[in-house]
Design a protein with these regions (language model features):
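Cyclophilin-like peptidyl-prolyl cis-trans isomerases
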Residues: 4-190
Length: 190
């Protein structure tokens, strides 16, 4: 009887440890994928932005696809408001253009305009009207929460963003001297 009890307990322990091992392997297989980095080379310096592929996949895929096609290369930051944001991504340079399509909004409670360096999709003020235009904040802007999809954050070159923010502007907040995105590339996370 004692042998049967010991064998039964040993069997239960083996089954339990086997189940735990499977659970651990499963949990270990769900590793967080590192987000890629957008590198925006401007005539004022370079900005690096972590793209939130894990949280806003539609918007980041759209941005990455456009960047990899060279869509942003040579486009200006057409709207600059010191203390608020810098905006670019319009192929016409007038603030009215885009890629010829729009994408869905991806608002998240865990992504907020809580400081400078937030990358978000510009829109017309109506739902699901983002396309290629984006902006980077120069300050905390909580009134924009749930109105613009946040899809990244500056990780290097915030001094360049601030410098662009101090650019002299004219009519419709357009820089007097063009601030050009010379090249926009995507690199793997470090």
């Amino acid at each position: 009887m004692k042998k049967i009890l010991i064998m039964l307990l040993a069997g239960i322990m083996m089954l339990t440890s086997g189940c735990l091992a499977v659970g651990s392997a499963d949990n270990g297989g769900n590793k967080k994928v590192a987000n890629r980095i957008a590198v925006i080379q401007t005539n004022k310096g370079t900005i690096e932005i972590e793209l939130f592929e894990d949280k806003t996949p539609i918007t980041t895929k759209n941005f990455i696809d456009l960047a990899q096609k060279g869509f942003y290369d040579g486009i200006i930051f057409h709207r600059v408001i010191d203390g608020f944001m810098i905006q670019g991504g319009d192929p016409t340079g007038l603030g009215t253009g885009g890629p010829g399509y729009t994408i869905e909004d991806e608002f998240r409670d865990d992504l907020t305009f809580d400081g400078e360096g937030i990358l978000a999709m510009a829109n017309t003020g109506m739902p699901h009207t983002g396309g290629s235009q984006f902006f980077i904040t120069l300050a905390k802007t909580p009134w924009l929460n749930n109105h613009h999809t946040i899809f990244g954050k500056v990780v290097k070159g915030m001094d360049v963003v601030r410098d662009i923010g101090h650019t002299q502007v004219g009519f419709q907040d357009r820089p007097v001297h063009d601030v050009v995105m010379e090249k926009v590339t995507i690199k793997e996370a470090e």
